[in-house]
């Protein structure tokens, strides 16, 4: 059996169905996970729980969107090194506007792409 890192994957997604789908994929691959419905909840989680293996970040969310979350993450020395994968339905030039992210996943999500990306970012022990 593959053993993944002890640190969970943080899923930041406001759409409950999308969030549950991502978490089901993570469960299937053997990854622990935590959930946040917006950037504010994600920052609160990070303050309480420490660094996940990677953050799967939606962009369009209420309360605090992914753009603002990412800016605050990069401004915080404790959080800036946590890898981020942007999860979005919009692929228009995002790589230019999100330098330094670990990858992009486009909706609708493809299980194989998610698994390959996570295996690269959070290798098995």
Predicted regions: what is each one?
Residues 85-88:
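Hydrophobic/aromatic residues positioned on beta-strands within the core alpha/beta folds
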Residues 35-44, 66:
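Helix N-cap/capping motif at the beta->alpha junctions
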Residues 16-34, 103:
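Two-component/phosphorelay signaling modules centered on CheY-like receiver
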Residues 44, 67-80:
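Short amphipathic alpha-helix used as the core "switch/output" element in two-component signaling
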Residues 68, 90-106, 112-116:
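Alpha4 helix (beta4-alpha4-beta5 surface) of REC/receiver domains from two-component response regulators
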Residues 57-58:
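Active-site residues of response regulator receiver
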Residues 61:
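Receiver (REC) domain active-site loop signature in two-component systems and cognate sites
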Residues 1-10, 110-125:
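Non-catalytic signal-transmission and effector/linker regions of two-component phosphorelay proteins
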């Amino acid at each position: 059996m593959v053993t993944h890192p002890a640190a969970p994957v943080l899923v930041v997604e406001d759409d409950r169905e999308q969030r549950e789908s991502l978490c089901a994929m993570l469960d299937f691959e053997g990854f622990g996970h935590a959930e946040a419905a917006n950037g504010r909840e994600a920052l609160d989680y990070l303050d309480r729980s420490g660094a996940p293996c990677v953050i799967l970040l939606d962009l369009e969310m209420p309360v605090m969107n992914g753009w603002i979350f990412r800016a605050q993450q990069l401004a915080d020395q404790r959080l800036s090194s946590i890898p981020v994968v942007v999860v979005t339905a919009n692929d228009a030039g995002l790589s230019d506007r999100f330098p330094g992210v670990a990858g992009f996943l486009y909706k609708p999500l493809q299980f194989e792409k998610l698994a390959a990306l996570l295996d690269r970012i959070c290798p098995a022990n």
